[in-house]
Amino acid sequence: MFKNLIFLFFIGLATAIRFNLTDLECSRLRGPHCGTYLLKVVGTNATYVGEKSFIGLDALTESKGEFFQRMLEQEPRLIPRLFTIAENDTANFTPLTFTTYLKTCNPQSIENAMIPFVNTVTSEISFDAWAYTAQNSSRITGLSNQLMNSTLYNVQVATCTPGFSALLLDSPTINVFNNEEGMPSWCQPIELTPVCPLDEGFN
């Protein structure tokens, strides 16, 4: 039992370390100013990194007043979200606007500044309220730069199915693997590139 705990600890540690990036430049960011961009899947016309959402059972079983109050408080758990890729006109899908710190151009936040996490066992990326309390979760820093420059930072970016959340929302998850890891058969490698929201028709 003790050996298993040590093994799991080192797996989690190794996974967490690869997300600690510093001194990153924004030479590939082509937003209106340094650090406002969308991540587009290379080789597609309108497929972006974004989120799909659904209303949880607890929200459906409470009164309208309680639901509205939780919505005003922007409670993340009220409407769980899946970090995924999809075409812009997909139902319940919203492309995410990534931002960076203007002075250094290092990644600062994703959309509404929620902190992304990675599952150290499945390598699935998530940033909803459940990710923080989920077992095997590890905080990510420098996520957007790794997604854009995966080969430079020795990681593989992939979309994966099946999975409970992927089946529920009919969308793949986004996972990050070390280059030396074998990718599961249910995953497909993808390449992402930053694009200016205005150039893509977003206001």
Swiss-Prot record:
Protein location: Cytoplasm, Cytosol
Main subcellular location of this protein, as a coarse class: cytoplasm
UniProt keyword terms in alphabetical order: Cytoplasm, Signal, Zinc
Matching Pfam families: Vel1p
Keyword set includes Calcium: no
Induction statement: By zinc depletion.
Signal peptide range in chain numbering: 1-16
Any one annotated GO CC term: cytosol
Family of this protein: Belongs to the VEL1 family.
Protein's UniProt name: VEL1-related protein SPBPB2B2.15
Species of provenance: Schizosaccharomyces pombe (strain 972 / ATCC 24843) (Fission yeast)
